[in-house]
């Protein structure tokens, strides 16, 4: 990567995205910050310094995507694109509003597709595209069925693109465990191995600077979930039922 990287972070207004922006800015990167909240983005960009730019974006809106892509393209080739935008609404399936469920699919999965489709036009040759899955995508979790399904889809999307774009782009997958954000604060169950957004940001940046396809953390949780996902269903599903 270049000495001074240009990095586009989507989902930068809070949580992991905001922590990533702060950590990358501290490490000397030049940032393009996107999310739906223009006010939060402008405040973050002002806090980080004049070399960073806020570009509001709704990944579920094609006009917004086109406008943001045009703005990013004017900044010149980007070194990394990191897609973190996500929605989450925990609860039993009978309680989940169908329109909310559809929006979760649109933001988490279709939004990742839209960003992946734009990335080759905006990244420099060999640049990095990172999509955010989750340990919830390793195996379906109770009361997170739509979220788990979308994150499983993002994992498959990243795997497909890693093979499809080999030699053109460096496609990566980020799979966090439980991170203390507005999304996880909605859960009403014990979340093991919880980490702070700052810890998550450091793990992501350090992982993306290696050659590994998947960046997953904290390992004591992610390896356990990976093991659970390869067990036969008769063994795995009773165990997942105990997770919430």
Go through the PLM ranges and name each one.
Residues 27-44:
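Conserved glycine-rich Rossmann-like NAD(P)H-binding loop of the short-chain dehydrogenase/reductase
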Residues 173-174, 189-223:
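C-terminal helical subdomain
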Residues 13-14:
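Conserved glycine-rich cofactor-binding loop
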Residues 134:
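Residue(s) in the substrate-gating loop at a strand-loop-helix junction
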Residues 92-93, 97-105:
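Substrate-binding pocket helix/loop in short-chain dehydrogenase/reductase
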Residues 116, 150:
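Active-site helix of classical SDR
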Residues 48-63:
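Rossmann-fold cofactor-recognition segment
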């Amino acid at each position: 990567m270049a000495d001074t990287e240009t990095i586009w972070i989507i989902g930068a207004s809070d949580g992991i995205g905001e922590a990533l922006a702060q950590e990358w800015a501290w490490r000397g990167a030049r940032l393009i910050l996107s999310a739906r909240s223009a006010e939060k983005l402008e405040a973050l960009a002002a806090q980080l310094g004049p070399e960073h730019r806020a570009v509001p974006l709704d990944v579920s809106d094609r006009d917004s995507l086109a406008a943001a892509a045009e703005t990013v393209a004017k900044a010149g080739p980007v070194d990394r694109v990191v897609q973190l935008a996500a929605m989450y609404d925990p609860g039993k399936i009978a309680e989940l509003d169908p329109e909310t469920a559809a929006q979760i699919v649109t933001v988490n999965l279709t939004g990742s597709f839209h960003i992946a489709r734009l990335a080759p036009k905006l990244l420099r040759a060999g640049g990095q595209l990172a999509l955010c899955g989750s340990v919830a995508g390793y195996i379906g979790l109770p009361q997170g069925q739509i979220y788990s399904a979308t994150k499983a889809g993002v994992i498959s999307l990243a795997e497909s693109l890693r093979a499809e774009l080999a030699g053109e782009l460096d496609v990566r997958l980020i799979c966090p465990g439980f991170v203390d954000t507005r999304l996880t604060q909605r859960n009403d169950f014990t979340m093991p191995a919880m980490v702070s957004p700052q810890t998550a940001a450091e793990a992501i940046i350090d992982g993306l600077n290696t050659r590994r396809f998947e960046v997953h953390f904290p390992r004591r949780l992610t390896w356990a979930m990976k093991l659970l996902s390869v067990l036969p269903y008769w063994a795995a599903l009773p165990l997942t039922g105990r997770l919430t």
